[in-house]
C-alpha cells in the first residue's frame, strides 16, 4: 500500500482538525478533485486508486503515533483521544470517470468535516504515485538525485545564504513515498541547519525532523458558511483560530480572498497577535513589500514578523526572495513539487479543494489566475462583489 500511516499527511490537517473538533463538530463539507495538467488520462488507473483508498480507510492511529501527537505543545489531549477512535470511512469518498469522457476523473469527498478532513493529502499522494508507477515503470532516480544534489549545492555554496532555510512541503505532489523519504533525508544530511523541517508528520516523527504547518485555505473557506456574515468570514476565521491556539501557530494565510481583502481584515490587532503571514499566490516580491509596509503602518516592527513563502518555489526563487527581504523580517520557505517530484518528468498539477460547507458554496479568490476553484458561478460573482474584487483576466474558476 502507498499510505501505511495516517500521519503520512501535512501537519496543518491536524491543527485544522482540532479546531473543527472543538468549534465546528457538526459542519458538513464537500471537496472535489481537479487535474490542472491538460491531456492526462487518469481513467485507466481508477481501480488502483480505489484499492489504495480502501487501504487508507483501513488504517488507524497507533499508540506510538498518538503519543507523538500528544507531545506537541499545541495538540490537546481530548483531540488525541478522539484520534484514537478515528478512521477514514470509504462511504464519504467516490472515485468515478468524468462524464466529460476526456480522461479526467471525478473524486468527490462529502460528509462531516471532522471525518473527511484527512482525505485530501493522502488521496492526492495516491493519485500521483499510481499515475507515475504506471507511466514511469523504471524511474530515473539517478537524474532525481543529481538534481537534488545541485539544489543543495546551490543553496549551500554561498556563505551569505547560511541563514536561508527551506522546508519540505511536498507530500501531496510527490513522485512516490519512497522518493519523498529519500529527499527529506538527503536535505537533512546535505543542508544541516538550513533544512528547517517538513510538513509531513510521519517523516517528522520517523526521522526526528521538525513538523511544520498552521492553516490551509479550506479553513478560511469553510468560515464563509460558518461565520455570522460573509464579509466578516476572514476575520471570523482568524478570531476562531486565536481562540483555539491563544497566539500559538500564528501564521495567517493571506490569499483566500486576495491580498487587498487580507490587508483590510488583518488590522493592528491581528498584526500584533499573529507571528506572520504566508504567501501562496500572486507576485511574492510585491506581496512581501506590501506586508512589510502594512506592519509598519500598524506599528509593528517587521523584523519581529515571519513571512512564509510557499507558492511554486524552486531554489533560485528562494534565494532571490531571501536576498530581497533578509534583515527586514524573519523568513521561511516551503518548497513542494520542485523537491519531491523533480526527476525530469512533467509533474501533475492536481488539487482537492473544498467547494461546499453546510450545503453552501465556498470559494477561494486567488491572487493567481486559474488557482480559484468553485462550481457555482453566481456565488463566485457574489463573493467578489462582497469583497470588492475584480475577476482576474484568464480566471474561470468553475472550470
From Swiss-Prot:
Reactions catalysed: nicotinate + 5-phospho-alpha-D-ribose 1-diphosphate + ATP + H2O = nicotinate beta-D-ribonucleotide + ADP + phosphate + diphosphate
Residues carrying Phosphohistidine: 217
UniProt pathway annotation: Cofactor biosynthesis; NAD(+) biosynthesis; nicotinate D-ribonucleotide from nicotinate: step 1/1
Keyword Calcium: no
Enzyme Commission numbers on file: 6.3.4.21
Record PTM text: Transiently phosphorylated on a His residue during the reaction cycle. Phosphorylation strongly increases the affinity for substrates and increases the rate of nicotinate D-ribonucleotide production. Dephosphorylation regenerates the low-affinity form of the enzyme, leading to product release.
Main EC class the enzyme belongs to: ligase
InterPro entries: N/Namide_PRibTrfase, NAPRTase_N, Nic_PRibTrfase, Nic_PRibTrfase-Fam, Nicotinate_pribotase-like_C
Domain of life, per lineage: Bacteria
Pfam families (alphabetical): NAPRTase, NAPRTase_N
Keyword match Isomerase: no
GO cellular component, one term: cytosol
Annotated GO biological process: NAD biosynthetic process via the salvage pathway
A single GO molecular function term of this UniProt record: nicotinate phosphoribosyltransferase activity
Keyword set, alphabetical order: Ligase, Phosphoprotein, Pyridine nucleotide biosynthesis
Homology family: Belongs to the NAPRTase family.
Role: Catalyzes the synthesis of beta-nicotinate D-ribonucleotide from nicotinate and 5-phospho-D-ribose 1-phosphate at the expense of ATP.
Family annotation (NCBIfam families): NAPRTase, PRK05321.1
Protein's name according to its UniProt entry: Nicotinate phosphoribosyltransferase
Organism: Burkholderia vietnamiensis (strain G4 / LMG 22486) (Burkholderia cepacia (strain R1808))
